């Protein structure tokens, strides 16, 4: 990303806020460090809700799609061969920290234990990039949101194959958990 390029997502004029949108928007708009773990069934709009909350709040947004293969190099940075030279490239976590942006760890329950490198980041501290001997502190406004189809406990019913049980210490780094709104309490009027 170009350091001067805005990473604020575009507002979708067709988006209709629902569920916990106002809660997510409040977290994003506050500019405070408040990691939130957002759970819900696949396809119910978790990621889009967070993106649109960032658009409304005019907050920069970095999305990282997590897989079982995601590791420290993918998240924090790595060396890459560019024009015949080996060059360090910051990962999306470092870029979001330095810009004071909102970082979305999408589908975090697909991750392996390789994401434990994020522990200091989730504690609100900086992170040491040992490969380049550099410490990165989070800029004002940086925060982390994570989405998951499960609550980090895996999928016993087989609906979400590939999801993993997340380390309890890792889950505890998210002071806010946003769960799907239950509509079972709604009563619909009957037509007579």
Predicted regions mapped to residue ranges:
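AAA+ P-loop NTPase catalytic core and its hallmark functional loops
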Residues: 2-186
